[in-house]
Amino acid sequence: MTQKIKCALIGPGNIGTDLLYKLKRSPFLEPVWMIGIDPESEGLKRATDMGLKTCATGVDGFLPHVLEDNVQIAFDATSAYVHAENSRKLNALGVLMIDLTPAAIGPFCVPPVNLKEHVGRREMNVNMVTCGGQATIPMVAAVSRVQPVAYGEIVATVSSKSAGPGTRKNIDEFTRTTAGAVEKVGGAKKGKAIIIINPAEPPLVMRDTVHCLTETAPDQAAITESIHAMIKEVQKYVPGYRLVNGPVFDGNRVSVYMEVTGLGDFLPTYAGNLDIMTAAGARTAEMFAEEMIKGTLKLEPVHA
């Protein structure tokens, strides 16, 4: 039995609960706490049934237990506007924060594009962009590593049932954060992000459209090869990531149409947007946990 790094999850909604199922399978991470603000929350009840300690008084109610339970990584699946405070309080106790909100106070991480860059940087807060960002930025990066991209636009369509109250409150932050990461991580000079929440019944699988305008005529063979290689990288942790059509070339425009089917851990398989976000968060935390177990990463308290 290898040593596991103890984790806490903040926010027992769709994302937090789906993440809990994934962490339960992790060889490096052990979820021990679930933190919420509503004692009647379904997510907290489910976490209790799964053997976790729970707290319904927010992060403040959890702080006294951090050191005694040796919690070293926390996942924030709440909302962008409370994340900064949550992060400050936990960083002060030496807890590494994986941010699944669009707060983006830490550096962006999209695993197949830049996870390795985070190794050895000793960051205490890493932001997972958004579900739309995780699904589309690898495709923008696949084009921009072949040749310069002047403009990258992504359209993420998710089912209404998969978008909980937290996601809805964060729509503006979603578009800003995703557009910023299309530039910073995807490599586009200018980025734009659009989200569509589709109320259709039965719920639709997550669909993503990516358009890139290249500065010069696109090298079709190299871009096609790069896109297929990147899809294989994403499929290592999200097997339901699939190319529906493309790349389609029209002048300098390169378009890719993706579909993301989930594993069905918490919500049914249509909620690929949950899967790609939680799988990316778990993958990132596992990399840090492996370093901690090896002794190459020691977390230090950060006082704001």
Curated annotation (Swiss-Prot):
Q: Indicate whether DNA-binding appears among the record's keywords.
A: no
Q: Which InterPro entries match?
A: Acetaldehyde_dehydrogenase, Acetylaldehyde_DH_C, NAD(P)-bd_dom_sf, Semialdehyde_DH_NAD-bd
**What keywords tag this UniProt record?**
Aromatic hydrocarbons catabolism, NAD, Oxidoreductase
Enzyme kind, highest EC tier: oxidoreductase
Instruction: Quote the catalytic residue positions.
Output: 131 (acyl-thioester intermediate)
Binding site residues for NAD(+): 162-170, 273
What's the family?
Belongs to the acetaldehyde dehydrogenase family.
Single Gene Ontology BP annotation: catabolic process
Enzyme Commission designation: 1.2.1.10
Name its species: Dechloromonas aromatica (strain RCB)
Extract one GO molecular function annotation from the record: NAD binding
The superkingdom of the source organism is Bacteria
What is catalyzed by this enzyme?
acetaldehyde + NAD(+) + CoA = acetyl-CoA + NADH + H(+)
Provide the protein name: Acetaldehyde dehydrogenase 2
The record's SUPFAM superfamilies line, in alphabetical order, gives: Glyceraldehyde-3-phosphate dehydrogenase-like, C-terminal domain, NAD(P)-binding Rossmann-fold domains
